[in-house]
Amino acid sequence: MTEFRDALGNITQINDKLERIVSLSPSVTETLFEYGLGKKIVGVSAFCKRPAETDNIRKVGSYGTARIEVLDEIKPDIVMMMSGYAEPLYKKIRERYNTFLFKLPTTVFGILELIKEVGIVTSSQDKARELEYAMLQGLKKVRKYSMKGYLEIDLGGPVTFGSQSYITDSLTLFGLTLPFEMRQHEWMVPNDQEIVEFDPDILIYEGKMYRGSNKEEVQKAFTDRGYGNSSFMRNKNIFVTPGKLDFFAHHGPSFFREVIPWLRNTLDSVSL
C-alpha cells in the first residue's frame, strides 16, 4: 500500500497491485490499456471508447455522473477520475470508495505528465517510461507555421479554447496565432464577431462525439453565422477532424499518435 497525493491535495492509499479498477476518464482508460491493465478494469464511463475493447466493460457513469449501485456491486479497489468538471462527483464517490483524481492537462507536456502519473499510481513505471519516450518521438513532427487559426468543437454547442487548454498549447506549438490564446480560460463559448474581426486563415472543426461532421455541413453552419467573407471560407481552408470520436478533445496517448501527425499533415496542405 502506497500513499499518493491527488490533484486536490487529498491523500489516497493505493494497493501496489490493483485488481479491480474503475476509470471514469477516457484518457486514463486508454493509458491503462497501454500498460497492459485492461483486464483489471471492471468499470468505465460511457465516453471511454479507446481502445475498442472498452465496449465490453461495464459502464458505470459518464463525466459527471456515476451509478453508485453499480460501484457497490463491482467493489473497485480504486476509482480513477479527472479534475475539472467531474470534481463534485469525485467528492461524492470518495465518501464510499478509494478514489484518485488526476489533474486535467493544460499543456501538451501536461498530457505526458498525466500518462506518466497513471504509470506511477499503478506501479507501471517501467512501461510509463517506455510510453513517454515513444510519445516524445511524436513531438518530432512539430514544426512552425505562420498563419492565423481557429479551432472549434461541438460539445453540445460551439466551444473554443483559451490559454489554460492543452488544445491551445498544441496549436501554438505549431506556430498558429489564435483569437483567444491570451484569454485566461480553459474553454469558452466563442464570440463570432471577435473571430470574424480576427479573420483566421484556417478553421479546424471537431463535430459532436458519435456524430462527427463534414466540410459541407461546417461551411454552411459558419456561413449562417456570418463568416461568409472570412479568409478560411474564401480559400476553402476548412478542416474537419477524422472519425466520430473525440479527437482534440481527448488527451490520452492517441493525442501524440493521431492528433499531432494529423495536425502537421493538415497544416502542410494549407494554401494561403
What are these regions (language model features)?
Residues 1-4, 10-14, 20, 78, ...:
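Extracytoplasmic substrate-binding proteins
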Residues 2-5, 19-87, 179, 227:
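A short, structured surface patch at a secondary-structure boundary
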Residues 45, 166-187, 207, 240:
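His/Asp/Glu-enriched short active-site or ligand-binding loop at hydrolase and phosphoryl-transfer sites
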Residues 50-53, 93, 225-237:
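Short, conserved catalytic or adaptor-binding loops enriched in Gly and charged residues
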Residues 50-57, 70, 109-114, 215, ...:
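Short, charged, surface-exposed secondary-structure boundary motifs
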Residues 65-84, 98, 191-209:
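Proline-aspartate-enriched helix->loop->beta-strand connector
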Residues 87-93, 207-221:
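A ligand-binding cleft/hinge motif common to bilobed small-molecule-binding domains
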Residues 162:
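A conserved mid-domain beta-alpha-beta active-site/ligand-binding segment of alpha/beta enzyme cores
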